[in-house]
Amino acid sequence: MCSIFGILDIKSDAVALRKSALEMSKRLRHRGPDWSGVYSSDKAILVHERLAIVDPGNGAQPLYNPERTHVLAVNGEIYNHKELEKTLKVDFQFQTKSDCEVLLALYKEKGPAFLDDLNGIFAFILYDAEQDAYLIGRDHMGIIPLYTGRDEHGNFYVASEMKALVPVCKSVETFPPGHYLWSKDGELKQWYKRDWMEYSAVEHNVSDKAELKAALEAAVKRQLMCDVPYGVLLSGGLDSSVISAITKLYAARRIEDDGKSEAWWPQLHSFAVGLEGSPDLAAARKVAAHLGTIHHQIHFTVQEGLDALRDVIYHLETYDVTTIRASTPMYLMARYIKAMGIKMVLSGEGSDELFGGYLYFHKAPNAKEFHEENVRKLASLHLYDCLRANKSMAAWGVEGRVPFLDKEFMDVAMRLQPADKMCGKGKIEKHILREAFEDLLPHEVAWRQKEQFSDGVGYSWIDSLKAMVEQEVTDQMFEAAAFRFPINTPLTKEAYFYRAIFDEHFPLEAAARTVPYGKSVACSTPTALEWDAKFKEMADPSGRAVMDVHQQGY
């Protein structure tokens, strides 16, 4: 994982701004500790902090076209870069073996209208010195974070994380997923549009489990593009187990040369985190033994988790309760992974949104509502699980990849017949995915019920959090929450506690507005609360709150 930082539309002293840019970019260096690169002129400044994953020896950024008139800073991976290079219609002399350099070639051929050609995870700034123009883009799901802001002089800032903007900007915003900004027209434009975003486009489709299985296997294989040691996150739940099982199928050969040579690190390492005796650790051991991975159990204590909260909120840049609960164990695990020399991991985020895996989906009244909730969940995922998967790993210089959110696979998964995904009436959640991959997993894992990550690492983790905040946040403090936090006023003492820490790190009103807000049960959207009157009465967002829903489905 890398970071990018840019100052564009420069209206003040460029020399002073260059010094400031270098200082602000240091705040992002945890994302890219391997090398720093900078481009600066009177019109634009781009700084890149690199985590070397592909072409470690020659892929330093910013990247340039041969004429050095186009400058590119990217945080991401372009999984289909080789295919794109073969289809280029313009002559372009590549300078490196970096997967990201193809963006410069595509820009030469198509101008700004190339983003939908990409299959990958990315956030980038491309500066065209010939036209004094810039292009900013973010991947389809917002897997890679990106923020923008303006200072008091009107200079335009772009950064991978908000912490590099808050000290210098008066305003900050999240750059929306699936969009680009081309300075020549000054408009944010949505490049990621799919037919399946409308129920009418999929309601008569016929599901094909064989196609689903092949598409996910292809997605995992694509995402093994890597020139450094990698591993898998294995909680023992369905999603991480499926990704781990597929990864194991391809781990012995190098993906980069189409399997012609042996992998540089053929032994697959898997990682699980939890409190002593947690459900996840037991399930993960079973899967690891079945797959034959070199398995690592990371135990943490409740006190270690509590001690990490302030750092977790700083790195995650959120005060969302479920995100912080789940991110804390992942943040602790990432440190262990980094110490092992692993620089990239694959994980299972996105499956629950694609297949309706959360327990509240049992209450979906019909296929249309089920599908539309899938679409809503995917649209907001960059504020929750994508943010967690990226930033909790990037805090320690580890890159997280999420094959379920592969652009090509998503098209297959979201074009399944929605009725075939529905749970309830004797069907467990994500049954179509379980059926497709049950041959790769132990039966009890393939059919293990969904648990939220923060529950699976050990129930006492959440219980201890609640007990701690009861001591830290008095009734008097909570009663005055609306006065202290008029924007997105905390609804619980736990939310109050996290919000207070967030505001210490990011004392800017606009920063608070970047965090999602509203009532949720088991990760539902506000719309889905209408499915059951009891949902509105539940105070805790944990999946445990709707455990009875699962039982009622049988």
Residue ranges and their predicted role:
Residues 209, 273-334, 360-369, 391-392, ...:
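ATP-dependent adenylate-handling ligase core
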Residues 342-352, 358:
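Short acidic/histidine-rich active-site segments
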Residues 1, 339-346, 365, 370-554:
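Adenosyl-5′-phosphate
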Residues 1-319:
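Cysteine-centered catalytic environments shared across enzyme families
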Residues 125, 321-333, 375-378, 473-479:
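Short, basic, helix/turn surface patches
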Residues 104-105, 241-248, 331-335, 356, ...:
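Short, hydrophobic alpha-helix immediately C-terminal to the catalytic nucleophile
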Residues 17, 80, 96-99, 118, ...:
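Hydrophobic (often cysteine-bearing) scaffold residues that line and stabilize catalytic clefts
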